[in-house]
Amino acid sequence: MSRIRFYFDHSLAGYFLRRAREKWFTRPPQRVNHHGVTLQVDCLPQEMQGILLAGRYECAEVALIPGFITAEDKVLEIGGAIGFLGLYCRKIAGVKEFVSVEPNPKTIAYLRSNYELNGIKPVLIEAALAAADGPVQLQISNLFWTDSLVSKADQSTGQPITVAGLSFASLVERAGLQFNTLIIDIEGGEKYIAFSDLPEAVTKMLIEIHPEIIGMEAYKVLETLIRSGFSVQGHSWNTWSLQREKAFRPRGQG
């Protein structure tokens, strides 16, 4: 009997049976510990589950945050997603004041659930960063990290929803926090930020740029930041950490 089982397991039929079992009967864990943060995964689409279970989610940011963002920093995060970076900063980096901005109602539900799992209450602004205040169309899909205000070449799997839009100045006012650090990942929406008008108190930035969505405008964002006194501290893929001296003023001013 064992010999028959051996030959069956190593046959083509045995291979397809194993694949069927893996697909239909093997359930992913309900939760995963990702770099010290507990995240709910069984509610997410299969592709997103796979990325989290493989430990590949937000790898660039995790590589750049240690030693860059500290417990003394006050952080405004634009693009809160499912709450991982906020929780990582709170739990691992020790940040005490952290405000997240996220427009997608479904993703907000994931964020709130993950914060609850980790015993932390989120401070959340439910809106999208936009060029001006008012309702905006957000393109969403099952993969929350593709949500964007910017039209893309391939929107075949997405759908538009109407969400509240706030200008950067309005977000700053709504946050009610004298933050010194910005975390930005908004799928091309970085082009809507007037980086040359950043509050002087902002001395640190962790930003993912998206040239695949907004083309050369993404690199103009970096150029504007450097002209505003920021210098590159590190980068991983399209994510950059930048820092400047406090109360920087461009040449010819002040």
Predicted regions and their residues:
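S-adenosyl-L-methionine
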Residues: 1-104, 109-113, 211, 218-219, ...
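Glycine-rich adenosyl-binding loop in Rossmann-like folds that engage adenosine-containing cofactors
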Residues: 29, 35-62, 125, 130-170, ...
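A short acidic, amphipathic alpha-helical/loop segment
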Residues: 64, 88, 192-201, 220-224
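Active-site segment flanking the S-adenosylmethionine/decSAM binding pocket
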Residues: 74-82, 160-217
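Hydrophobic packing residues within well-ordered alpha-helices of enzyme cores
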Residues: 89, 111, 138, 193-194
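Short, conserved SAM-binding/catalytic segment
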Residues: 111-122
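Short, hinge-like loop/turn segments at secondary-structure boundaries
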Residues: 116-118, 139-145, 200-202, 223-225, ...
